[in-house]
Amino acid sequence: MIQTYHYSNILPRLNKHFLGFYLDDRLVGVVTLGWGTRPLHTIKKIFPSLETKDYYEIGRMCMTEDMPKNSESQMLSQTIRWIKKNCPEVKILFTWADGMVGKPGYVYQGSNFYYLGYIWTDMYMKNGIKLHPRQTKQFFAEDKEDKRLTCRPTFEQQQEVGIQHYRGKQFKYLFFTCGKREKKRLMKECTEPLSRDYPKDADLEWKMQVGKGKWELCSRPPYSTDMNSEIDSGIGLEKAAEKDTAAKENITGNVA
């Protein structure tokens, strides 16, 4: 279902639970719980006393668009209830809203999550397909004279093969799943401002690299989907972009 309805079509690497939500016998929503690429660093930066075991991060969340309004908020509410019942040791539900693809996090705002601000994140893209920096190396001949430690392509390399480099905002949210006493303690400890002064569409911004070290504000990047094993193994970027566009014309989905 995630491959069909989630814009990214791939899963994070660290997944602990997969929750399915049904209307009668039909699967209409999915939430995955786990951690991002740096689990301990993520939580320590916000709550220094907490460990990886003390929180879950929403990896993917998607629901069919034929569901009634506010269904995503109901799904989130059920997710929180499930965590409290089945994972009482978990104190925090953490998540990101991907402003890069135009999402300031309205579903989290509607579910009364706390907002913690935003970061700027990078996206490399070719023909509408998002690439991890490591995935860009397949387009370049090996350069033994390149002594840089990073796997990120230079601006000249990007220009050579038609890769665009964008920057956009990612918005941080969390919900306390612990008891009132622990919540009070954690709110005092929190190193980032907790608020419900939420971002809106007007707060979305994007930048495109136009030269070495030079960036200009731009419109929303023409993102189609993420590079996955199917694309990487032979379908090709052009055909993958066409396939994803056709699928989205036939199947409508929604994501937080």
Model-derived regions, located:
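A short, aromatic/hydrophobic, helix- or strand-capping loop or linear motif
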Residues: 12-15, 206-208
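A hydrophobic membrane-anchoring alpha-helix module
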Residues: 171, 175, 180-184, 189-193
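Short, cationic low-complexity segments
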Residues: 186-256
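Short hydrophobic/aromatic beta-strand or adjacent loop that forms the aromatic wall/cage
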Residues: 16, 168-173
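Acyl-donor binding region in acyl/amide transferases
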Residues: 34-163, 172-175
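Short Pro/Gly-enriched beta-strand edge/turn motifs at strand-loop
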Residues: 1-5, 154-157
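Helix-loop element at the rim of GNAT/NAT acetyltransferase active sites that forms part
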Residues: 8-10
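Conserved beta-hairpin
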Residues: 2, 15-35
